[in-house]
Amino acid sequence: MNTLKNKNYYYFCKTLTESIKKNILKYPHINIIYYDNKPNISDENLQAISKFCKKYNIPFFIINNHLLATKMKANGVYLESINRNYKHLSNKKLIIVGSAHNQIEYFIKLRQKCNLIMFSPIFFNQKYSKYKTMGVVKFNLTTRFWKCKAGALGGINQKNLRNLRLINSDNYGVVSLIENKPAL
């Protein structure tokens, strides 16, 4: 982990258990993205995650809901690749992180004024087959001339942690790494 200590990690979560909290605190530059199908301000999990983030000064993002992000005083909003609206552009205080799977979605995220675009899937995981993953070389070639910061997302675990040194990015989405899921 020594060579990757100045990188930014993004963890997607619905709930926080004690083991996940301990793992989160191991990473110095971690950001938490709360995702739920229909998040609302009275959601207990959202309140608990927000409180945890404020206590430990961890940047906090809410998925696809800029109004809720401003009400909860979150640092920003995370826009999924399927989200193609432009309603969030009026709020200048929020950091906007987007997700893309190809160049077309990248250009949509650029128009949405995203500060960071997470490009996925980089490694094999349960959601994508090995034929749909891009790998290190394709990721670097695709994001080489992007006009905004790029992040790697998808399948990052203990098994392929060394490969992150080869990626031309400082931002990674790490779900499997935090939850200690075994490598496939």
Question: Which residues does each predicted region cover?
Answer:
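N-terminal amphipathic alpha-helix/helix-capping segment at the start of soluble metabolic enzymes
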Residues: M1-K21
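Catalytic cores of alpha/beta
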Residues: N23, F60-G76, H101-K113, R144-W146, ...
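Alpha/beta enzyme core
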Residues: S19-N31, L67, I82, Y106-F119
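Alpha-helix-loop-beta-strand connector modules within alpha/beta enzyme cores
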Residues: L46-F61, S90-Q103, Y131-L153
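N-terminal active-site wall of soluble small-molecule enzyme domains
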Residues: K26-K92
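Glycine-rich phosphate-binding active-site loops on the catalytic face of alpha/beta enzymes
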Residues: V77-H88, L116-T133, I156-L184
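Generic hydrophobic/aromatic pocket-lining and core-packing "Φ" positions
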Residues: I20-K21, L46, S50, H66, ...
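Hydrophobic faces of well-ordered beta-strands that scaffold small-molecule active sites
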Residues: K7-C13, N31-Y34, F60-I62, V77-L79, ...
